[in-house]
Swiss-Prot record:
Required for accurate and efficient protein synthesis under certain stress conditions. May act as a fidelity factor of the translation reaction, by catalyzing a one-codon backward translocation of tRNAs on improperly translocated ribosomes. Back-translocation proceeds from a post-translocation (POST) complex to a pre-translocation (PRE) complex, thus giving elongation factor G a second chance to translocate the tRNAs correctly. Binds to ribosomes in a GTP-dependent manner. PANTHER family: TRANSLATION FACTOR GUF1 HOMOLOG, CHLOROPLASTIC, TRANSLATION FACTOR GUF1-RELATED. Residues 6-188 form the tr-type G domain. This is Elongation factor 4.
């Protein structure tokens, strides 16, 4: 295999969830003989069970294939798989930075989705050659002409000569590979310059330590050299380099333009942050632009149902953290739920995936509190605090202002659902910035508070648009607003895990709706349970869970009324005593009640 740069093609695939990206990748591997028929597990690249089950790609993967083109030359194709979901957009931008081109795979029956548009713009901004591919053209609902027009109007790239393919039946796969060889430029790089390599992804292997997927920009990386990670300034000796075919295949070295893996005995994933630059120790080059540490945006408390699982939960989070630099966690204790962890996530999908993996892979039973976002709190003394837990908000008398994170959302929705979607955005305190009609789709830009989005916005967006609307968002700024802490008291005891930060205008309405919900969820006791909603010291709503009544007079038939009175009096005193010392167990549903904010529930 000649290692000249002109015979290398680095590309990734941009596609919405379920538009057939992983299937196309499998076809490429099959066609280029990367695996035997027996080894072809459906969706080779989605190696996590959860990835296959949800049909999404979470971590970036890569494959190096040798392809014999129609022009008689053999090309080395490096395919870097990217995650498609909005929570993982930083991982996408790093995967794209390692490529010279991208395939834009669009489902011919469904058309363009907001997520695809966002990733496609990232690719175009980074100067990649984008090749459109219409997949699933054999479906009865496929409408290639409409989709071609959508691609040209919404994304603005020429799509009339797009390859028509069906990954399932293998149609158009060879043509797609020919397009890659013909249209995607070869990588530029200097084989003799000092080493410069981009870390596309890192994951932890129990035997090897951290394995990093890298794209070599200049120079070459080989075994036994001493490499340096730019952001941490740490140095390591390289133990092994190689490529994935998709099996791990060691090589002597990787040169400029190539994509492969590096193992250097790094013990934890923070040692090789995604997007960082690797150079040779003592002969450093300037770091590559665009690296930024990952910031969690959504926070939630995870508590084990039985307190003896606390250490197991810590261990499980530590193991997940090895593979997921975006996951943050620190111990937290709650009066209502005992000991647990405050965890930070990239977004809601990320949170669900972590929670599901903890329960599935580590057999833990967990209670999750309502997710919140980070707020900036300016105190009267002029200190600026970052608060990710409503229960740690300072006393209202000490607060000058509370600032909430504002996001810029881009929503793509078919014409007929625009009204419903705009109504939903208004309800979520969104401010419309821009609106464009494109064919039969509308692209709407809104600025809205992130805390309104993390609760149930995605679910409601899907239900108001019958599943057709899609959205992507990015963080804009912190902005001061009139926010208050809404607390809930059960039996006059505040339950810290139920506290939420809400806008003052909707606080009373939210408080009343939630105590009604709690009333239905909290099981009846032998005594009345009072549920109250409060802002500071002011109670804004109250309801009761009625006591169960035990018929103590059932054993008296006929006879003296004073006997019955005595028994009822005794029961009354017992209930009074019980009420003063009785505690109320809150079921998991009570903590989830805070999540859904819509009135119709």
């Amino acid at each position: 295999m000649s290692n000249q740069l002109e015979h290398i093609r680095n590309f990734s695939i941009i596609a919405h969830i379920d538009h057939g990206k992983s299937t196309i990748a499998d076809r490429f591997i099959h066609l280029c003989g990367g695996l035997t028929d027996r080894e072809m597990a459906a969706q080779v690249l989605d190696s996590m069970d959860l990835e296959r089950e949800r049909g999404i790609t979470i971590k970036a993967q890569s494959v190096t294939l040798n392809y014999l083109s129609d022009d008689g030359q053999t090309y080395q194709l490096n395919f870097i798989d990217t995650p498609g979901h909005v929570d993982f957009s930083y991982e996408v931008s790093r995967s794209l930075a390692a490529c010279e081109g991208a395939l834009l795979v669009v489902d011919a029956s469904q058309g363009v989705e907001a997520q695809t548009v966002a990733n496609c713009y990232t690719a175009i901004e980074q100067g990649l050659e984008v090749l459109p591919v219409l997949n699933k053209i054999d479906l009865p609902a496929a409408d290639p002409e409409r989709v071609v027009d959508e691609i040209e109007e919404i994304i603005g790239i020429e799509a009339h000569d797009a390859v028509h393919a069906s990954a399932k039946s293998g149609v158009g796969i060879k043509e797609t590979l020919e397009e890659i060889v013909r249209k995607i430029p070869a990588p530029e790089g200097d084989l003799d310059a000092p080493l410069k390599a981009l870390i596309i992804d890192s994951w932890f292997d129990n035997y090897l330590g951290v394995v990093s997927l890298v794209r070599v920009i200049d120079g070459k990386i080989s075994k036994k050299i001493k490499m340096k990670i730019m952001s941490t300034k740490e140095e390591y000796v390289v133990d092994e380099v190689g490529i994935f075919t998709p099996k791990r295949t060691p090589r002597d070295s990787l040169s400029a333009g190539e994509v492969g893996y590096v193992i250097a005995g790094i013990k934890d994933i923070d040692g090789a942050p995604v997007g960082d630059t690797i150079t040779i120790s003592g002969n450093e080059s300037a770091p590559l632009p665009g690296f930024k540490p990952v910031q969690p945006r959504v926070f939630a408390g995870l508590f084990p149902i039985s307190s003896e699982d606390f250490e197991d939960l810590r261990e499980a989070l530590r193991k997940l953290r090895l593979n997921d630099a975006a996951l943050h966690f620190e111990p937290e204790s709650s009066d209502a739920l005992g000991f647990g962890f405050r965890c930070g996530f990239l977004g809601m999908l990320h949170m669900e995936i972590i929670q599901e993996r903890l329960e599935r892979e580590y057999n833990l039973d967990l209670i999750t509190t309502a997710p919140t976002v980070i707020y900036e709190v300016l105190t009267k003394k002029g200190d600026l605090l970052s608060i990710d837990n409503p229960s740690s908000l300072p006393d209202p008398s000490l607060i000058e202002e509370i600032r909430e994170p504002i996001i810029q959302a881009n929503i793509l929705v078919p014409n007929e659902y625009v009204g419903a979607v705009m109504k939903l955005c208004l309800e979520k305190r969104g401010v419309q910035k821009d609106m464009q009609y494109v064919g039969n789709q509308v692209s709407i830009h809104y600025e809205m508070p992130l805390n309104e989005v993390v609760l149930d916005f995605f679910d409601r967006l899907k239900s108001t648009s019958r599943g057709y609307a899609s959205m992507e968002y990015d963080f804009k700024r912190f902005q001061a607003d009139d926010l208050v802490k809404l607390e809930f008291l059960v039996n006059s005891e505040p339950v810290d895990a139920l506290a939420i930060i809400v806008h003052k205008a909707t606080a009373v309405q939210r408080g009343k709706a939630l105590i009604e919900k709690l009333r239905k969820i909290i099981p009846r006791q032998m005594f009345d349970v009072a549920i109250q909603a409060a802002i500071g010291a002011k109670i804004i709503g109250r309801t009761n869970v009625k006591a169960l009544r035990k018929n103590v007079t059932a054993k008296c038939y006929g006879g003296d009324v004073s006997r019955k009175k005595k028994l009822l009096q005794k029961q009354k005193e017992g209930k009074k005593r019980m009420k003063s010392i009785g505690s109320v167990e809150l079921p998991q549903e009570a903590f989830l009640a805070v999540l859904s904010t819509s009135e119709e529930d």
